[in-house]
Amino acid sequence: GKPAVMLTKGDIFMSAQRGASARHVPHLRFVKCTLQDLSFVPALDEALINDTIRPAVVPVVDQLIDGLLRPLTEEEKATPEVAANQYARETFTGTLDEVNDHFYRRGWNNGLPIVPPTAEAVAEMLTGTDYPRDYVVAELPPMLGKATVEKIAVNAVMAGCLPTYLPVLIAAVKGMVDPVIHLVGWTCSVAGFAPITMINGPIRRDIGLNCGNNLLSGYNKPNAAIARALALITMNISGCRPTLEDNAYTGHEARFGVCFGEDEENSPWKPFHTEFGLDEKDSAVTLAWSHHRSFVIGGK
């Protein structure tokens, strides 16, 4: 093999290390610099290069050269073992409060009460799909967790979903790995983004999704539960943890997401999913990540 070096920032170094390990290069060489986030810079011009980029990169050029020229050690040359598609099962017995405390301590929720994912509850959730429980829907970045149907169902139970919501969650997980989404960028950014899930087609009415007034407010069970389930999936399968992968400076009040349906029946436009070649009778999930907010006052 040939030496490779990743240039990273000190405040996201741990995230970079964990990401490299997840991609089977645990001994990747790193060089830390002080370059700040340039996501919102309008253009890469001479002033930016001279005033911001050069002062951060020039001091570490020698380290970069050394990392690229220094021969690999035997440890770095070794091929890492790739774990099989298995995950440890854990059984915990206790009161509802004890279960919630245990899950919170393990980092499996954000502290709000969950529905315990008992074997019976997960089996009931799996009745919402024809997929086998061990079917891998996707490998979710940043940590490339294998999102099996069973794992998705576990998080759906925890979030308070009904089995009829499971097809929406499976479709959303498939969408998460679309290159257009660039999930790593949104989940691991230093900026705060909010996941947005919009649903089209007959399934909106089948599951009772709110598509009208207060559709963003989370009063309605399907809207709130689906958004929370996807947030838990991002934590527990994607492996996105605060300060480890999610490096947002201030975060976002809607970080755990919003879910709503398009009000197709009262909209002056054709349903959004038809713009992508789908039929109006098809059900579809659209994913996006929002940073800015808009205020709508009066009227519809």
Where are these regions (language model features)?
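Short, surface-exposed basic-aromatic patches at helix termini and helix-loop junctions that form
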Residues: G1-K2, S21-V25, L278
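Short hydrophobic alpha-helical runs that function as membrane-insertion/retention elements
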Residues: P3-T8
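Conserved beta-strand edge residues that scaffold enzyme active sites
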Residues: D11-I12, T34, I170
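Active-site-proximal loop->helix
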Residues: D11-P26
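Long, charge-dense
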Residues: R29-P42
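A charged, well-structured terminal subsegment
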Residues: S39-E75
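N-terminal accessory regions of nucleic-acid-interacting proteins
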Residues: T73-E76, A84-Q86
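Non-transmembrane, aqueous-exposed alpha-helical and coiled segments at domain scale
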Residues: V82-K300
